[in-house]
């Protein structure tokens, strides 16, 4: 099974080697036929501490690094 890759904006980089990425998805509501935006935050492992708040990054699934971190930084610029 291929690893999932998501793109989002870094909202926090205060932790050591961890960033929080806000990923937004858009879909059409089946009943109202209206475009709806939903967002979710993911904790991602950033080994080089290269991502800063406001950067657009791509993250990919990996084996669990800790309780919350199951994603890693794939590329810094999307």
Swiss-Prot record:
Record organism: Parvibaculum lavamentivorans (strain DS-1 / DSM 13023 / NCIMB 13966)
Gene3D superfamilies recorded: Nucleic acid-binding proteins
Tree of life domain: Bacteria
Keywords: Ribonucleoprotein, Ribosomal protein, RNA-binding, rRNA-binding
NCBIfam families: PRK05610.1, uS17_bact
Gene Ontology biological process terms from the UniProt entry: translation
Assembly and binders: Part of the 30S ribosomal subunit.
Function: One of the primary rRNA binding proteins, it binds specifically to the 5'-end of 16S ribosomal RNA.
A GO cellular-component term linked to this record: cytosolic small ribosomal subunit
UniProt protein name: Small ribosomal subunit protein uS17
UniProt-listed HAMAP family: Ribosomal_uS17_B
Keyword Lipid metabolism assigned: no
Residue ranges of the TM segments: none
Alphabetized PANTHER family for the sequence: 40S RIBOSOMAL PROTEIN S11 FAMILY MEMBER, SMALL RIBOSOMAL SUBUNIT PROTEIN US17M
Pfam family, one: Ribosomal_S17
Sequence similarity: Belongs to the universal ribosomal protein uS17 family.
One Gene Ontology molecular-function label: structural constituent of ribosome
InterPro entries linked: NA-bd_OB-fold, Ribosomal_uS17, Ribosomal_uS17_bact/chlr, Ribosomal_uS17_CS
Keyword RNA-binding annotated: yes
């Amino acid at each position: 099974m291929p690893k999932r890759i998501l793109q989002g904006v870094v909202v926090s980089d205060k932790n050591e080697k961890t960033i929080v990425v806000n990923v937004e998805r858009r879909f059409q509501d089946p009943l109202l036929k209206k475009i709806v935006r939903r967002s979710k935050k993911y904790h991602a492992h950033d080994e080089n501490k290269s991502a800063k708040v406001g950067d657009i990054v791509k993250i990919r699934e990996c084996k669990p690094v800790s309780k919350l971190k199951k994603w890693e930084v794939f590329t810094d610029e999307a």
